[in-house]
Amino acid sequence: TNIPQTMQDLDLQEVAGKWHSVAMAASDISLLDSEEAPLRVYIEKLRPTPEDNLEIILREGENKGCAEKKIFAEKTESPAEFKINYLDEDTVFALDSDYKNYLFLCMKNAATPGQSLVCQYLARTQMVDEEIMEKFRRALQPLPGRVQIVPDLTRMAERCRI
């Protein structure tokens, strides 16, 4: 399965801080198709650790409410890829970022990358930039399978979205 190239370099200090999930995409839309879907999570913050690992703070739907979770992402030899243990996903990687406005972040299971791939367009504000949205669409094209984008999350009143 052909997964697009991740960023060659990722400056953790530059991606640190608050983010908003403005668009999501998945190789299997059932991973995202409802508020309770397993990988429909809203990333709030990225926090680098002194060891160059990454703490991902997110919110997800749980029992008709919303729960905050932390995922510990362990650095790998690739500066833009991290090992995680979250549901069936074991890898998180950055596809692209300009650090100031957007970050495209994906999660996958290395054993079945074409079946459980989920990506997010994260923005520093809740505003969707159409140029960046188009860039997100293009970044997803080389992904395996038919990756579908969940419609504009910023217009949805979801309990876990901040």
Swiss-Prot record:
Gene3D superfamilies: 2.40.128.20
Gene Ontology MF terms: retinol binding
Tissue occurrence: Synthesized in mammary gland and secreted in milk.
InterPro entries linked: Blactoglobulin, Calycin, Lipocalin, Lipocalin_CS, Lipocln_cytosolic_FA-bd_dom
Coiled coil, from the record: none
Location relative to the cell: Secreted
Superkingdom of source: Eukaryota
GO cellular component, one term: extracellular region
Summary of the function given for this chain in its UniProt record: Primary component of whey, it binds retinol and is probably involved in the transport of that molecule.
PANTHER family: GLYCODELIN, LIPOCALIN
Family: Belongs to the calycin superfamily. Lipocalin family.
Protein name as annotated: Beta-lactoglobulin-1
